[in-house]
């Protein structure tokens, strides 16, 4: 037992079976005492091939080779040698037998005595995951004397000074202290430590699991400080009773991940990157540095962090070759010295001197101690000591699991590496399902370069099965594609490799993997991780046995079953009585798994059956034919019986169906012959649908009608507002209501109100300057606006009320329509009932027999309806004939009242076609009558069409009757035939007719008779029809006459209604025309009234001006006389140039202006007026201000919204037609003169020193330069101020006051000035001075009447040179009676200082003098008729 186990465990010097343990101690003692040669010992040790290979021959007692004793605790527990319990004893006594006894390695735990299990309880940790051969190779490098670079000094865990927002500063400080105390110098906290800390919170496991998943953001199984702080924070949340979030808030997640990245980047990267690991050995110089020192086997230290250092005392040996101990075969033999075994540090690296040399291997297999990692397989290496023992494979943990016990190539029967499979446990731990695996994974440590065979070992299969069961939680037996992607993706391989692996593992393309296929996939992944390429085709060793055997088994079973079916002659056999067990003839199933012909062969199962089929004899074939014939006969007999039963059932069902049909026919006949049957179809679905469509049409018209009503309401509101404006303007002529707004729709805007207020202020100012009271206004400024707003509010309120009423009507109409629609729907049928009705009445979706029956019922119903209609018509005809016979004298009355009952009878008893035809006939009659009334020729064949229609209807009715009777006869014959067929038996012949005959002819069916009496009934009906035909024709003629009379009466009523409608329309049009005429007359009347008012005002002004002129003449005569006396006295005195003009200028210009201004109002509008200025003169100031912006509201064309159209019409209606000559010469500033700011700018411009410039520029189109005056006030402030005065009601009064005050300073010329000034006033714009341009205009128009005065003397020096400096001042034109102009002589005396000017001309003159304007001499042209006035010479 020991030999075989040690063979697979790799022990080379294991004891021979049966040898006592104490017999080995002398050799251990002799070897320990320093013997260097191997004496011929017992033969049991001779054939022990150890793991050193060639070294065995020269090393002598080479049993003390390094023994790999670090086996897992579960398998090789007693393999720890030289550890506490044995080490002190060996150190004290040297080479004592107990020491060697404690080194029995490689034995199974159950095969050793209890005393050898003491060293296993030394407390050393057991390594769970073996290292790769590359790691072992790197660990050998320090044996050669080259010390590895010292690792960087571990610094304390540095936590960045970053403040976490989700915890307080105090909590963060506490957590930092706790974290540092837990992790020490590390940067992360292990999962176990974190678990220990988290469990102190006493929270449930589910909450702690959630906390771990949320905290471990890196999914590394370790916690950085921010993750640890987050875990503490979540624990605090749960302890305080709050729920854990399903996912971390984005802010917290970002903070934690950022801080983790900072900590990760702070880790110093001082260690050199390891070289790329390959299967190539490292043949560097350090390999040969320590050749003299024999290898020092180390005692096993599994899972010690210094395990790599324990192995560094061995010489650097590249692994990967097929040698169990990792030594090269080419290495030179070691010298046979016992000193090589002295420094055996079997548990403490770097301290070999503390342990005594322990000769191991006498009782145990020589195994390298201190090394428990997996090693490549070691081929048997015999040492020459003997060949009676089988070669031993040593040095592997998985050597126990890699024992081939079956045929090579099968799963689990493979020469697996004796040292096991590296990193298979790490791969298992990586792929196991665990919480938090969703976040990521790391494939670090999974790759290697171990030798992996094609086949799957048992241990590997067990690991893969455990993985499969762990992931297959529901025990489905397979793993889906999504789960497999998650598992295989954690291996870290490329997607392309995983796709190829999946294709190989899932050959049937089922999208899922069972346990064996999953093992194949994992094995391919494991091979790929160890550097093997993924094969393009799955090798035979990896084909799952279940799949391979299943396919073969299925093919075998199919062939066997097919051949067995061919061999079995059980065609006519019905039971097991004829069965005979014949082993020779039986095909016989032989399992290929239990009985194998050879190594790989299996029994050809189909061979026997094929041979037996070929060996059938003729008798056997005949027997089979006979049996098959018997079976066929039996089947035929069974089919016949079944057919008979089915026929019986069909006949019974048919009889029941016929009975039901007969009952249905009787019920239908009863319904058709019922007196109220005509009212049955009045409320049909078609009529309901028609009514619903009509209702929808009417409902669609409601919005259109409502919109029309709203439009009419809107027009009414606009007309009412316009009418109110007209009435208000009529009642308050001087109010602001006469203003027509310039806003949209004629509304008065704020600008219009501002203009109106400005005009009112100018009117009041003019009245104040004129010394007259302000003209009384009917209302204040805002009264008209308030009245308009009140009326507008009233109209709007009424419109809103009407709108509310309209909406209420709309809503009520909609509600009524909905109620009607609901009533129509309620009366109708539901979808299910409608489906049933259409199925059983319209024969939709039923069988052919049922459909024919339904059509038969419909035809019989129509036939009965036709019969009833004929009878009803006959009865109606008889009643009409009797009524006409009883009352022959009441023809007229009967003709008037007969249409109504006739129509009702026809509508009640006639068919739908008849009613349609009658309606069409009546419509044709009405059309013909209307055509005749319109003078068109109606159709001549109207009477013929009626007769033809009657004949056609008669023939159709006869045809329908005949067809109905034929159908009745056919149905009766068919029924009789069916009854005869069903009564096949002689016993039922007498009973069945008696029971079946009465239903076809129930007593209620009056129209039906048997087949024998149908002919007589038909003849009787034909005779009755002939007799009734004449009566019916007579009734039809009478009915037609009555209908014609009724149609004529209706047409007459319609014509009367049309005439009444036309009369009403004409009356309405007349009322509308009268209303329009009334509105127009009102406008004209208002215009006439306004014109009369203006004429009266003009006459009053003329009278006032005339009186003022007369008074002025008297004063002027006295003043002139006084002036002449003064002139005579100072004749010898020379007047200065400056005084003369100062004294003379008021005499010439001011009286001229004062005399002209009164004449503006008294004179009739002369030729050449501009439309707007004349309007300003005639109309009120409020109207004149807005005449250029908007039309007045009193024009006849008030309906037009065009302001220009109103303006023209208003001007035409109020102003006499002027001559067109002066109009083109109007200045361009006229269109802009209504702006008060423009006038202000003109005033500012005129107040400048060059005040004469605006005057000539303004008069350039109308005035000649030679008539201009250097110091004239044409462009000064006098223009604008006089304009304001003119626009006021008392504007003329101010000028009258000026003429009264200064009238004596000039010759009295009222008439000439009055006659000639008005055109100038009217030819200028409203805002420009009406009086200023007048003198140049008059001078231009009448140059011949007034000769220019002589030039002044050379003494004066004009200040402002101008081309017209020598021209006289602009004198007004004089009448023919004016005296000749006095010659220029002595300048007149200065005017009295107390005489102020009447207008703004005086201020303008003073301003011009102050500005430095020089005055020239002027002469006064005296054209007055006063004889007492003398001439003033310049």
Swiss-Prot record:
Keywords: Actin-binding, Cell membrane, Coiled coil, Cytoplasm, Cytoskeleton, Endocytosis, Endosome, Membrane, Repeat. This is Actin cytoskeleton-regulatory complex protein pan1. The keyword Translocase does not apply. Residues 171-259, 460-549 form the EH domain. Residues 203-238, 493-528 form the EF-hand domain. It is found in: Cell membrane; Endosome membrane; Cytoplasm, Cytoskeleton, Actin patch. Component of the PAN1 actin cytoskeleton-regulatory complex required for the internalization of endosomes during actin-coupled endocytosis. The complex links the site of endocytosis to the cell membrane-associated actin cytoskeleton. Mediates uptake of external molecules and vacuolar degradation of plasma membrane proteins. Plays a role in the proper organization of the cell membrane-associated actin cytoskeleton and promotes its destabilization. It comes from Aspergillus niger (strain ATCC MYA-4892 / CBS 513.88 / FGSC A1513). Residues 1401-1418 form the WH2 domain. Residues 55-68, 88-120, 306-341, 361-370, 600-611, 895-910, 1144-1155, 1320-1329, 1421-1434 have a biased composition (Polar residues). CDD domains: EH.
């Amino acid at each position: 037992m020991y030999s075989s186990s040690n063979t697979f465990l790799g022990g080379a010097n294991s004891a021979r079976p049966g040898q006592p343990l104490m017999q080995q101690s002398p050799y251990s003692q002799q070897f320990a005492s320093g013997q260097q040669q191997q004496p011929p010992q017992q033969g049991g040790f001779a054939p022990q091939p150890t793991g050193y290979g060639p070294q065995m021959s020269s090393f002598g007692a080479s049993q003390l080779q390094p023994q790999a004793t670090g086996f897992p605790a579960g398998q090789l527990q007693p393999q720890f040698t030289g550890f506490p319990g044995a080490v002190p004893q060996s150190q004290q006594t040297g080479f004592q037998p107990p020491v060697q006894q404690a080194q029995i390695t490689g034995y199974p735990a159950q095969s050793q005595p209890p005393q050898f299990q003491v060293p296993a309880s030394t407390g050393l940790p057991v390594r769970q995951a073996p290292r790769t051969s590359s790691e072992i190779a790197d660990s050998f490098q320090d044996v050669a004397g080259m010390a590895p670079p010292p690792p960087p000094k571990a610094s304390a865990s540095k936590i960045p000074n970053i403040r976490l927002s989700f915890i307080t500063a105090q909590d963060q400080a506490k957590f930092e202290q706790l974290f540092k105390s837990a992790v020490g110098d590390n940067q992360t906290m292990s999962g176990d430590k974190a678990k220990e800390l988290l469990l102190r919170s006493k929270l449930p496991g589910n909450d702690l699991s959630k906390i771990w998943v949320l905290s471990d953001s890196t999914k590394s199984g370790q916690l950085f400080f921010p993750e640890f702080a987050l875990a503490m924070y979540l624990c605090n949340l749960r302890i305080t009773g709050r729920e854990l979030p399903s996912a971390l808030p984005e802010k917290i997640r970002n903070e934690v991940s950022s801080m983790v990245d900072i900590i990760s980047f702070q880790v110093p990267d001082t260690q050199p990157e390891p070289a790329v690991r390959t299967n190539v050995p490292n043949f560097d110089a350090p390999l040969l540095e320590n050749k003299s020192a024999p290898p020092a086997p180390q005692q096993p230290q599994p899972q010690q962090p210094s395990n790599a250092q324990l192995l560094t005392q061995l010489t650097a040996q590249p692994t990967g070759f097929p040698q169990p101990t990792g030594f090269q075969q080419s290495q030179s033999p070691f010298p046979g010295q016992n000193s090589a075994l002295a420094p055996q540090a079997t548990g403490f690296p770097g301290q070999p001197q503390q342990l005594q040399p322990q000769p191991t291997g006498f009782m145990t297999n020589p195994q390298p101690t201190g090394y428990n990692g997996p090693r490549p397989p070691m081929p048997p290496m015999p040492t020459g000591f003997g060949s009676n023992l089988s070669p031993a494979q040593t040095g592997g943990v998985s050597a126990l699991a890699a024992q081939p016990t079956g045929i090579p190539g099968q799963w689990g029967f493979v020469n697996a590496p004796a040292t096991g499979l590296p990193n298979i446990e790490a791969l298992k731990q990586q792929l196991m399902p665990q919480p938090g695996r969703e976040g990521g994974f790391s494939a670090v440590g999974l790759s290697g370069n171990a030798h992996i065979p094609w086949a799957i070992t048992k241990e590997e299969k067990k690991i893969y099965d455990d993985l499969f069961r762990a992931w297959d939680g529901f025990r489905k037996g397979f793993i889906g594609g999504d789960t497999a992607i998650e598992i295989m993706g954690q291996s870290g391989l490329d997607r392309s490799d995983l796709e190829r692996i999946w294709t190989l593992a899932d050959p049937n393309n089922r999208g899922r993997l069972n346990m064996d296929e999953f093992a194949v996939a994992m094995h391919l992944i494991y091979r790929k991780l160890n550097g093997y390429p993924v094969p393009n085709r799955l090798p035979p060793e990896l084909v799952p046995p279940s799949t391979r055997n299943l396919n073969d088994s299925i093919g075998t079973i199919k062939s066997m079953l097919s051949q067995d079916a061919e061999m079995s002659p059980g065609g006519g056999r019905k039971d097991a009585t004829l069965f005979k067990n014949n082993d020779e003839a039986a095909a016989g199933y032989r399992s290929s798994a239990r009985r194998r012909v050879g190594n790989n062969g299996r029994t050809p199962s189909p061979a026997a059956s094929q041979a037996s089929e070929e060996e059938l004899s003729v008798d056997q074939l005949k027997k089979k034919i006979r049996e098959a014939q018997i079976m066929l006969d039996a089947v035929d007999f069974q089919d016949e019986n079944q057919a008979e039963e089915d026929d019986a059932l069909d006949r019974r069902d048919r009889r029941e169906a016929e009975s039901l049909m007969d009952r249905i026919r009787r019920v239908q006949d009863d319904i058709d012959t019922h007196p109220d049957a005509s009212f049955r179809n009045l409320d049909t679905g078609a009529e309901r649908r028609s009514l619903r469509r009509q209702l929808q049409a009417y409902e669609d018209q409601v919005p259109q009608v409502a919109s029309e009503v709203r439009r009419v309401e809107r027009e009414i509101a606009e007309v009412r507002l316009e009418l109110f404006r007209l009435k208000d303007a009529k009642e308050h002529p001087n109010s602001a209501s006469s203003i027509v707004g310039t806003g949209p729709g004629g509304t008065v805007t704020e600008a219009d109100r501002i203009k109106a207020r400005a005009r009112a202020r100018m009117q009041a100012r003019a009245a104040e300057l004129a010394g007259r009271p302000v003209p009384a206004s009917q209302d204040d400024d805002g009264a008209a606006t308030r009245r308009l707003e009140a009326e507008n509010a009233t109209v709007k309120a009424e419109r809103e009320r009407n709108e509310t009423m309209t909406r209420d009507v709309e809503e009520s109409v909609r509600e009524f329509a909905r109620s009607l629609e609901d009533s129509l729907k309620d009366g109708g049928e539901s979808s299910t009932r409608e489906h049933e009705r259409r199925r059983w009445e319209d024969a939709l979706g039923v069988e052919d027999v049922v459909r024919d029956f339904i059509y038969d019922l419909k035809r019989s119903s129509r036939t009965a309806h036709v019969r009833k209609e004929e009878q009803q018509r006959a009865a109606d005809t008889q009643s009409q004939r009797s009524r006409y016979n009883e009352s022959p004298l009441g023809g007229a009355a009967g003709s008037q009242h007969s249409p109504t009952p006739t129509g009702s009878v026809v509508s009640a008893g006639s068919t739908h076609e008849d009613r349609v035809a009658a309606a069409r006939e009546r419509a044709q009659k009405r059309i013909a009558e209307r055509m005749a009334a319109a003078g068109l020729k109606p159709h001549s064949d109207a009477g013929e069409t009626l007769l033809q229609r009657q004949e056609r209807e008669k023939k159709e009715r006869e045809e329908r009757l005949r067809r109905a009777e034929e159908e009745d006869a056919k149905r009766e014959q068919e029924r009789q035939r069916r009854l005869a067929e069903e009564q096949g038996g002689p016993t039922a012949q007498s009973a069945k007719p008696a029971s079946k005959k009465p239903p076809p002819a129930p007593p209620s069916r009056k129209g039906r008779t048997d087949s024998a009496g149908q002919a007589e009934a038909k003849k009787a009906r034909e005779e009755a029809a002939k007799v009734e035909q004449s009566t019916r024709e007579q009734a039809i003629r009478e009915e037609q006459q009555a209908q014609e009379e009724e149609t004529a009466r209706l047409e007459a009523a319609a014509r009367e209604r049309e005439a009444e409608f036309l009369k009403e329309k004409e009356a309405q049009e007349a009322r509308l025309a009268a209303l329009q005429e009334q509105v127009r007359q009102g406008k004209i009347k208002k215009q006439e009234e306004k014109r009369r008012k203006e004429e009266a005002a003009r006459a009053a002004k003329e009278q006032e001006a005339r009186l003022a002129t007369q008074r002025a003449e008297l004063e002027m005569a006295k003043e002139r006389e006084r002036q002449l006396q003064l002139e005579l006295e100072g004749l010898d005195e020379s007047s200065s140039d400056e005084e003369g003009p100062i004294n003379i200028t008021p005499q010439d210009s001011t009286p001229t202006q004062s005399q002209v201004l009164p004449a503006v109002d008294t004179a009739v509008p002369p030729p050449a007026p501009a439309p707007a200025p004349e309007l300003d003169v005639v109309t009120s100031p409020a109207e004149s201000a807005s005449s250029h912006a908007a039309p007045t509201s009193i024009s006849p064309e008030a309906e037009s919204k065009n302001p220009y159209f109103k303006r023209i019409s208003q001007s035409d209606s109020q102003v006499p037609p002027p001559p067109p000559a002066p109009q083109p010469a109007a200045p361009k500033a006229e269109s802009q003169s209504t702006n008060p700011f423009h006038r202000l700018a003109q005033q500012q411009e005129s107040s400048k020193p060059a005040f004469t410039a605006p005057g000539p520029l303004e008069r350039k189109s109308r005035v000649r330069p030679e008539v201009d005056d250097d110091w004239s006030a044409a462009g000064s402030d006098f223009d604008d101020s006089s304009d304001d005065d003119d626009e006021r009601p008392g504007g003329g009064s101010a000028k009258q006051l000026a003429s009264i005050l200064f009238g004596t300073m000039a010759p009295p010329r009222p008439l000439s000035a009055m006659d000639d000034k008005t055109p100038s006033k009217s030819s200028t714009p409203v805002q420009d001075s009406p009086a200023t341009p007048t003198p140049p205009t008059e001078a231009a128009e009448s140059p011949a009447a007034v000769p220019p005065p002589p030039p002044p003397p050379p003494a004066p020096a004009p200040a402002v040179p101008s081309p017209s400096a020598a021209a006289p001042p602009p004198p007004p034109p004089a009448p023919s009676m004016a005296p000749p102009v006095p010659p220029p002589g002595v300048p007149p005396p200065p005017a009295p200082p107390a005489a102020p000017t009447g207008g703004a001309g005086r201020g303008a003159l003073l301003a011009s003098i102050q500005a430095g304007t020089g005055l020239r001499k002027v002469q006064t042209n005296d054209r007055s008729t006063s004889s007492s006035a003398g001439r003033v010479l310049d």
